[in-house]
Amino acid sequence: MMKIGVSTLFFWEYPMVEIFDIFRDIGIKCMEFFPENPDFWDNRFDLDYIADLRKEFLKFDVALHNPHIELNPSSLNPYVREAVIKETLWSIELAKFYRCKLITIHPGKRPTNRSPTDEEYEAFFKYLDRTLEVAINKNITICVENMPERINRIGWSPEEMEWILKRYDELLYMTLDFAHAKEYMEEFLESVIDYIKHTHISGVVNRKDHFPLRKSEIDFSPYIKALLDYGYNGMFNLELDDRRLEKNPVTKEEKIEEVIKDIEFLESII
């Protein structure tokens, strides 16, 4: 059976308790939780708030997305790298508390518009070494996400993702972002399908990501079917961006309608 989830970040402007209600009303049983949702982020050090949400999280199948805004695990600035490690270790503890079995992380990038150097890769590998050491002890699976194709990004090509994953074989896994992959989807499935434990899915319009899936100019349905046929039993997580919709602001009811239509579209594929 296809497991369909939705990113909490699509409903970023609402309190977490309201997001839980929205998901329940729609009938969603899976979610990808972004701690950087403003309501949660503003209360992240309030232990009573954190504890009160636990009973709600336990009602869902939850994957966690590591904080990434303003962060870069491949930074050559040691203070930035230290911040990334602190946030990641905090996320691992949070995932354990909320019984999330999986965390998605981003690879790094070179801050200038040039190809990453050996130093950026080395910084990223040191970050992975520390992250995996802690996560494995906590029985948390770490999945690195493929990035959009940019000259300064680590991990956008199938070849590079395969190289990274094989370096940490049986320790590190992958979150496959369909919209980031675009025309490389077939190559990703050919080279790293055994590592895929989680997915992000959305539509691509004019080469831009995170549109409603049903409006995508790239037909991802063959790859969805291929994953399912291969035995993939992870989440297909809708990662939509309200800025890609045709109006601003977008009401809660309009967002709910977009999610319902995309869920129906996904279900129609199989």
From Swiss-Prot:
Q: What cystine linkages occur within this chain?
A: none
In terms of superkingdom, the source organism counts as: Archaea
One Pfam annotation, family name?
Answer: AP_endonuc_2
Q: Which InterPro entries match?
A: IolE/XylAMocC-like (IPR050312), Xyl_isomerase-like_sf (IPR036237), Xyl_isomerase-like_TIM-brl (IPR013022)
- Name of the protein described by the UniProt record: Uncharacterized protein MJ1188
